Amino acid sequence: MHKSFQIQLSDNWRIQSSSKVSEKGSDISTNPTISENWLPAVVPSTVLSTLVANMVYEDPYFGENLKTIPTELFKVSWWYTSSFELTQEQSNEFASLIFDGINYKANVWLNGQLIADATDIDGAFRITSFDVSTHIKSGSNILAIEVIPPQPGDFSIGFVDWNPAPPDGDMGVFRPVTLHLHGGVQIEKPFVKTKVNLKTLKEADITVSAELTNYSKAEISGDLVGTIGAIVFKKNIRLAPNAKELITFDSKDFVGLNFKEPKLWWPINLGNPDLYNLDLKFVAKETVLDTAQLRFGIRDIQDYWLNDIHRGYKVNGQKVLIKGAGWTDDMLLMDTDESIEAQVKYVKQMNLNCIRLEGFWGKDHKLYDLCDEHGILLMVGWSCHWEHEIHMGVPVNERFGGVYKPEHISHVAQAWEDQVIWLRNHPSIFVWTVASDKVPITELEQKYIDTFAKYDPTRPYLNSTGGVGSDQHVIGSEDVISEISGSSGVKMLGPYAYTAPVYWFTDTKFGGAYGFNTETGPGAQIPQLESLKKMIPQEQLWPMGEAWNFHCGRYEFADLSRFTKAMDEKYGAPSSLEEFDRKAQAMNYELMRPMFEAFQVNKKKSTGIVQWMLNAAWPKMYWQLYDYYLNPTAAFYATQKACLPLSLVYNYGDKHIYAINDRQGTEEKLTAHIRVYSIGSEMLFEDKVNFTLDPDSSKSILELGKLKGLTTTYFVDLRLLDKTGVEISNNFYWLSTKEEVLDYEADLGPFAFHTPSKVYADFTQLNELPKTQLGQSHYFEQDSEQQNIKVALKNNGDHIAFLINLKVVDKKTGELVLPIFWEDNFINLLPGEERMVCANFKGTSEAELKVEGWNLE
């Protein structure tokens, strides 16, 4: 007999403002007619996402529609109610009602009874469970939740300066609600701890633990049985009434938990992200009272110190240069499973190995599960939203942010414990970040340390994602140093706005390629034209105006003035939206690639780089590698190119060509083919260099030096060939004899968020780039639910084909097919060159190819 059931209460919900409801929770949870005319909803959801789904408001992401939604609606509580059916047999079981996340407080009634009030459910990141065994019944059960919105000073969900604040503060039941039925003993907090033999990688010790709670009034004796593949282990347990006990299995008592030749979990480019399944069941008198399942990976995470200053990370003993970008959820927390899956695949497509979560994002475990499966490392922890008065709405401590009072310390420490227990089995999480811009107050950091010792000793933590160089006061006026753990060993010194390529290679004071830069980037990444037309009303598309600014960031990042000034200076002022689009994508590519490449080149003094940001919470102009509609910007393909495991790189600082090997093996008999072209596509220089690359290394293979006959704008073409002459990778640069000069003396005020340029490069000759004729053929092939496209390109002209942009369009709707996974894009072809480019996308609709480019006939 099996008594364990998990019932997800996701459908059949309705919501209504308490201002329109006179009945009490006891009435709402007994009389289904009260909510008959309320708005239909699902869970997880927020109040505003539900209103939008019911078309109460026009698309809040278009134009300035968001401004029309009154925040007063969300200053009162809102009701969520749902009914669910139980059989007579199910109603006789024990039951726990579990809330993974409610923002912010709640009173909960079930079948007329108050089972939890706002002192029990208090905080967006608290996870709560209630024994409702005596409250469930056969037939229809009604659950009513009064959700109380976050107030100024609450430790809620926030988006800092990335986008506008949601008018409802994301109030709602934003994570799953689960009814867990069991036979009296419940398995809670299952955990797998792995210890890898780092000398051989041929052995690993597995420790399995779980809490057993007896919810009955009688003593229960039974077996806790665990299974991992063919390995079975069990213990006989005797639980007194209402007792709770932590049960542990380890290899000392169960030799099967000493794994020989384990399949290790590795991040992308280092190996396969192998996973195992654990099944637990508690059996008493041949009846399964409860079960639990989880997935885990066998891996070892350690940190190390570079020159006693900079912190880095190792996975299974191998140093990993962290190459990542910062994630945000949808502004109304409306991410779908399909969207999350596409985004994780985009990360992999870009050759990134990490996502940073500033905030415990995710409506459920989907994001974390996918990162486990794809070998994407995760940095997970609190947001700086709680550290600054402008976001919290109340005064904060200059050094410690908003968490410094005893009652707040207890609240946040408990929320942290809940999140760690919720997520700790995900092998993709390699570090917990307990603060962002500041450090936790000593009492709070000690509570965090105690939580790690008790619940998760398997990975390091960071006391802050700021730290090294914090005396330079880029973010705030205080030094980011902990009294317990000292410096974090990582840095957060910007930049966050327009930054010239040379900066990343030459800067040794702020955000340049040394140490671990936990959030940085060259500023705005403008969406492609199709996306601009989706987010800005037609009449406001050109020239740029307030609607554009509304879709920028906040505060210092509320317009595009730095980006457009650089465009005007470097490329020439655009006279149309289409010209702006073309030049914006060129800048997206030009500015993003060198950031990642500089950290690749400087492997010996760099440990990590996180682009701020990866994605978009709503349609925006700033900080994104692909936009809200999942349309990659040119920065996406620049990142993809920069992070190739084997590549050639132009160093803007010393003007050398570097070869990069991200792999763990030696790469022998390689050849670099290096050519330089004028703006008229005349070859000015050519050389071939043979070399070998050590594992995980970079080295200079050629100094370009002073070349004769350069035009003001010129091109550098790099090809990496294997021992048979087959191309491994390519890279193409547009450079200027007028070198960009950084202005370190510029006065930017208290928040020195970037290093501007006082002299800009000159690419205006690109405006007269001679036209060329491009030939292409392509075909689509259906592969189950996926379509593949193969495109053969040939430059039939005598001039370089610059920034060829490939797009796939739905033939019926004319809309771009998204998401789409191109192996390369924004491609450059030499005269007479041919290249095959492939992509794949989901769907069966008839599609067609669009080919655009800077100088195509």
What is the predicted function of each stretch?
Residues 281-347:
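N-terminal carbohydrate-binding accessory modules
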Residues 183-216, 308-309, 638-671, 750-793:
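Surface beta-strand/loop "capping" patches
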Residues 354-555, 587, 591, 605-608, ...:
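Substrate-binding/catalytic cleft of secreted carbohydrate-active enzymes
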Residues 258-292, 706-760, 842-857:
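Terminal connector regions
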Residues 137-140, 209-305:
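Extended acidic/polar, glycine-enriched regions
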Residues 5-7, 11-20, 46-54, 70-187, ...:
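Accessory beta-strand-rich segments of carbohydrate-active enzymes
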Residues 7-8, 14-23, 42-46, 102, ...:
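Substrate-binding clefts and catalytic carboxylate motifs of secreted carbohydrate-active enzymes
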